Amino acid sequence: MKSTITIVAIALFGFLPVTLVHGQTSPKPAAGAKQAATAGAGKRTDVYHVHFTKAALGKAVELGDWLKTPDPHNPMPDHFIVLRHQDGDAWDYVVITHLGPKASVEAAGTAVPPDKRDLSEWHTDTFVNGPSWEEFTKAMGIDADSKSKTTGSVYSVSYYRPAPGHREQLEKMLGELPSAANDTTAGNVLMQHLEGADWTFLAIARYNSWDDFAAGEKNSVPQTNKKDGPWNRLRDHTDFHTDTLTDRIAP
């Protein structure tokens, strides 16, 4: 049975009010199983909101605390993940919120509390399509069976803009990378831009630990010397990309 739900969220941080329709979910894969493929490399059934934000001077802790607090007005208040910058691009946090299979922006909104208005220096908001929430949570290690065991996970967050005429090649490559024999990731997600920022694909790779991340980097460096290796192939198809290492602060 489907229901129509209106989400009214905080406009300043891009949690725009949306109307969405969502149905019953499919059973989750077995917990702890190694993901066979990148979630979202093929079928993308659901809409997500991606919010990158830079904290105002001296407000990083307050902003993080606010971002990781579930919005009680949302019908799916726990359908989000918050990642915190450790090394890489200029943003401090990224919040990825699941909206369901459909979303529409409405004019009505909720006023931002006065004490929250100055927490962010800047932000960007982008709607993307991606895998089901079940696939997403499995890949990111935040499903009910895993999230208490994956608090030490490391997430590499990357976004890409393909060179003109190379969109399909880049998308294919991003979906293939986790299948490499020396890959140490525990889960991968690929999402595609619908509306918002100037990138086309968002990829998130999860590692169980910093040791696993380091091992993956050590394994991949020799590949940069190969003409057909991932390092060179990426630069055959990409106009722009950034990579940022993060940890998870919610859930």
What are the language-model segments listed below?
Residues 14-22:
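C-terminal segment of classical bacterial N-terminal signal peptides
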